[in-house]
Amino acid sequence: IKLYEKLTQMKVPPRQPYVGELVYAAFSGSHQDAIAKGMAYRANGNDKYWNVPYLAIDPQDVGKEYMADVIRINSQSGKGGVSYLLESAFGYEIPIGMREELGYTVKGFSDNLHKELQNDEVLAIFRNEYINLDNPIKLNEYSFNRDNNYYSVLLEVQNGDTTVKLKGSGNGMLDSVSNAIKNCLGYHYILTDYKEHAKEVGSNSLAISYVSITINGKKIWGVGEDEDIASSSIKALLSAINRSNKEASV
């Protein structure tokens, strides 16, 4: 296309069939959700032939890329488009229950900036709004003791300018940490969802944890990222709690 435009001094219309810049682009939330589901279905080996909603042919057959030319993120985008981008381009496996909240968060940034967001901008929003948030509560150190399936924890956190030592117990590591935070720092919430997976980063593997808490009927998500799965899950819980503090202050 660039060669054609250079040699002819003619511009290829953005909606020109097969080759236009926007021919395969999906901005609409409902279109993105349908395409994301179709691509996921195809990735699982369920389709012998190309059969993805709103895409008559495979864009890669004509030199297009899914991330750059199909899923485009702006204020109209849906939960499926944002999650598909983070999963396909950056290796995150966004829980189904988190996708709507995340989609609205990213759309809000696009709306405020009045522009389409690039992949690295979406990642930056995800990291800044959800991952390893440490204000006002930051994890310093912890240790667990286990008796069968019952855990007790000694936890040190930074709560604003104060270093606080917490103690708690529960039916799992995360449950014991949650109880320590609620009992010692006075938070009131229900621990509602937890998911984890590994993400390859070069030759290393990171543990990614997703935690949701419910406060007054509203679910709030946080994400933790660490080489250690226990640290990752604790950071995810603290991210959710810190996000609840941020929302309460708005």
Q: What label would you give each PLM region?
A:
Residues I1-K167, S203-L206:
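A mid-to-C-terminal "edge-of-domain" accessory segment
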Residues N74, K165-G172, W221-S232:
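Short alpha-helix boundary/capping segments
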Residues A89, E93, G97, G186-Y194, ...:
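Glycine-rich phosphate/pyrophosphate-binding loops
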Residues G170-L174, I181, S209-K219, I234-A236:
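Terminal-proximal interaction/regulatory segments of ATP-powered molecular machines
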Residues K219-W221, E225-V250:
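Mixed-charge, glycine-accented linear interaction segment located at domain edges/termini
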